[in-house]
Amino acid sequence: MKYSVRILDIATRSGILLNYLDARNIGVLDGDRVQLINPKNSLAVTAVVTTTSTLEGQGTAGVYRGTNRRLNLTEGEEIEIREADRPASLDFIKKKMDGGRLTKEETLTIIKDVVNDEISAAELTAFITASYINPLDMEEVEHLTRAMVETGERIKFASRPIVDKHSIGGVPGNKISLLVVPIIAASGLKIPKTSSRAITGAGGTADLMEVLANVEFSAREVQEMTEKVGGTIVWGGATNIAPADDRIILQEYPFKIDARGQMLASVMAKKYAVGANLVVIDIPVGSHTKVPTVQEGRKLAREFIELGERLGMKVECALTYGDIPVGYSIGPNLEVREALRVLEGATEPNSFIQKSVSLAGIALEMSGKAARGTGAQMAQDILSSGKALEKFRQIIEIQGGDPKVKSEDILPGEHQFVVNAPASGYIVEMNNVSLITLARLAGAPHDRGAGILLHAKKGTLIKAGEPLFTIYAEREWRLQKAVEEGRHLVPVLVEGMLLDRVPSQSEV
């Protein structure tokens, strides 16, 4: 059946709005699938039906803007609509829901349908939930990783080694890629770093780099830039590298699901797809991180290493201290300013510098650039000499930014509120989750100037009335919201040496 097209400004990738009488004539209900065919060019996609009795008249079809990207229809043109077959991937998802193991072919079918929008958001959520309740074993993780790579773009460099680095997240202020990438590239190695934007954090690496330069490039452009200057820091979502991963992450977000198997596949698929054969994984360990204990960290590290071996990649993991933020800044502009200051020669903050050179040093040792045990010093020498700054400026320039940018050019939001210590004592705890929440309330990462600047960290003796941290915001209402809601978060806890006094029974 043919219908007149009306383009709806809805970004959903796979959807169509039909009058309920037209849907009945086609033989479909709400949530069913139809095949949409553009008669001009024979392009066809599958879309999920939503019915209406008022928003669409009979004979017209409301095609979502996201769906039309693959059909190239214009308003008023005709479209052919047919009932679509039920995808086989739904049977495989049901198999996983029932506790079964997925084969290589079944996993590939599911991921192909994810990429081609053959399954709905609800069905993808069912797959994610099934994999969370019935965890993937290592063979299934390998199948998932390879399927993610196979259904997207890949980069193949003419020579090796190709280095990459990833942090599993959970720690605010973890801006180390802004140092690690230029240090490694300045050593003569190649590091095509594709990064994520923040979903639950105050600033992903891509959000930070976007303060300085464009981060949206194709896979081919990433390869060309890496060949020219040795490294990139780009947003992976623009490259079509492992595209299924981005869609899975979006469905995980509302439930805060972070299934172990899918996390392993997510990280390693992107590294494999950019051609990396040497990978360093940062696993922050701490009470308010994704990995609460060293034992859990070692277990996760072994899983990354095993998956790497299955893929022909050498992986080393660093268990890093995650109970406090990295450095003193949280939020895009604040973190970028802190990173530039270190690249320009600042010798603080030590936590930021030490973590960055340690991870860069592992990569240098893995590649053979440095002997075992000397990598961190080599990384420190590259940083101290100014070679890392020079390389970072080259990366900024090739990505379309200003290579002459200085730390003082990067400013926080104009609205600020200082939080002072309520009593004298030691800072005994810094709650990473609360700090991230507070920075997001202030507007980060969308508002680049929003965030938190810490004035003291865990273990510091502080007097009543001295500043603990400053909240920055670009909009006054955002600052007020952060201050009001932040009163219940207690992101920094100060206690005296005397915790309590227990009197004798005679004094009770």
Swiss-Prot record:
SUPFAM superfamilies: Nucleoside phosphorylase/phosphoribosyltransferase catalytic domain, Nucleoside phosphorylase/phosphoribosyltransferase N-terminal domain, Pyrimidine nucleoside phosphorylase C-terminal domain. This is AMP phosphorylase. It holds the Pfam family Glycos_trans_3N. It catalyses: AMP + phosphate = alpha-D-ribose 1,5-bisphosphate + adenine; CMP + phosphate = cytosine + alpha-D-ribose 1,5-bisphosphate; UMP + phosphate = alpha-D-ribose 1,5-bisphosphate + uracil. Transmembrane segments: none annotated. It is an enzyme of class 2 (transferase). Catalyzes the conversion of AMP and phosphate to adenine and ribose 1,5-bisphosphate (R15P). Exhibits phosphorylase activity toward CMP and UMP in addition to AMP. Functions in an archaeal AMP degradation pathway, together with R15P isomerase and RubisCO. One of its GO terms (molecular function) is 1,4-alpha-oligoglucan phosphorylase activity. Belongs to the thymidine/pyrimidine-nucleoside phosphorylase family. Type 2 subfamily. Signal peptide: none annotated. Keywords: Glycosyltransferase, Transferase. One of its GO terms (cellular component) is cytosol. Its EC number is 2.4.2.57. InterPro entries: AMP_phosphorylase, Glycosyl_Trfase_fam3, Glycosyl_Trfase_fam3_N_dom, Glycosyl_Trfase_fam3_N_dom_sf, Nuc_phospho_transferase, PYNP-like_C_sf, PYNP_C, Pyrmidine_PPase_CS. AMP binds at residues 170, 196-201, 205, 266, 290. The active site is at 258 (proton donor). GO terms for biological process: AMP catabolic process; pyrimidine deoxyribonucleoside metabolic process; pyrimidine nucleobase metabolic process. The keyword Transferase applies.
